[in-house]
Amino acid sequence: MDLKQELATKGYAIVPNVISTEQVEIAKKLFREWQATIPDHDNVHAKVDPHGIYKYHHAGHTKHAWYLRTLPAVQAVYKKLWDCDKLITSFDGCCYIPKSLTKKDNCWTHTDQAPSSKGVKCYQGFIALTANKERTLVVYEGSHTLHERYFADRGNTSNKNWCKIDPAFLDTIKDTKRALDVPAGSLVLWESRTFHQNHYGKPNSEERMIQYICMLPDNHPKNTESMKRKRVKYFNDRRTTSHWPCPINVNGEQPQTYGDKSRLIDYSKVVKYDFPDVQMQEAIMKLL
């Protein structure tokens, strides 16, 4: 089964060996170096990054993120999917779950495509820097084909691109639930209608380290001149975004405080990476 057919049938796919063992180690080293720049990282990460997902601290513009986005082998998968020669990227964050974590899972299974949006619009993805089968992505196989009916039955016509799925409904399709066994170096893809969530798995089981990567064709109808200017601005400002390259939407720079000001991030202490290497600069600019 080819990749497009697998995505059309199952709603997800694991593409193994997209990056080499050496490239995995380079990215992991850069990832850990970035983590070390965040004061009191472990406590801060546990407190402000939901489900282990980095949304703050310029997480969309780390060295490891741009290293992986600009690798030809990663781009080649997206170019083949979209049958194009030129791509644009989101500035999505990354995810880290330490082996020592003992939190239990709750249900926040969701779809990232609005109820009002029909058909294939986007393929989300991540590069796995660790091998995982416990702390991993959970998907409901074939759920992308249920997206339209699910929301129609509930009279939901929202244009919001994040919608939680009713746990009672998920129980009716529990036989399609898959906790993915993901080798390091893989690119995991899923169609944005697919019902999915992160999964902690067993306590003290595995370290999980991934970089989210999502790309669309440069000639996408929503990639207007205004949108291109906005993406360049968000790059220059080092803003982290949702997974959609267009229309591009930034995350807030501060987490919810819930009255606790210690959760606020002091951006004067956050490293804002520059990319002085000319080849890297050129590779980045091609994706904006």
Annotate each PLM feature.
Residues 2-9, 16-116:
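Non-heme Fe(II)-dependent double-stranded beta-helix
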Residues 109-122, 175-176, 182, 206-207:
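A short beta-loop-beta micro-motif enriched in histidine and acidic residues
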Residues 105-112, 161-174, 209, 226-232:
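Short, surface-exposed loop/helix-turn segments at secondary-structure junctions
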Residues 116-133, 181-184, 189, 214-217:
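Short, conserved beta-strand element in jelly-roll/cupin
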Residues 99, 142-147, 214-220:
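Short edge-strand/loop segments of extracellular domains
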Residues 132-197:
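Double-stranded beta-helix
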Residues 79-88, 117-119, 128-136, 146:
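Secondary-structure boundary elements
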Residues 37, 189, 194-288:
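Non-heme Fe(II)/2-oxoglutarate
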